């Protein structure tokens, strides 16, 4: 019954899709829910990872297996979001300079690659969280999980801007700085730059780390 409700709302979403690419993604996801065929899910994931133009996007499905000790059984989750245009420009700059970061990283040359590319990255605003993503979620997501799809078709990497901002605001005034930061000068620098540097840290992880 739960999956029937998911399909019901996906069919509603299909009628108001942002573009034909997004409509095809939703249609293939519906087919997976109706058949349970993993081939349909793989085809959905490939269509989804190729849709880079839609401003509205989503995650929907049995995605992560963190809760299963064997890492075999995934839990259902959903996230509907829209792109943060201004912040996404920041991630695009980082991603487009992936080779520079690789060349200048402080590791032995034996571990460096001659040619690297940053993953497709953007900053999003979460509009709704469902399933295992509710009530709190990670500050970044990189999907799909299938290595062969990632190898042949790429992956999507996102930083969830409003979640990051909420976590930052919740951390302010918790007494940590007063207890552990050495000087007032450092406290002022943290108050001024901590949120931005935290966002850049996540961007570097999502754009270059993956």
Predicted regions and their residues:
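Active-site recognition of the HExxH zinc-binding catalytic motif
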Residues: 19, 200-210
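Alpha-helical scaffolds flanking conserved acidic
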Residues: 196-198
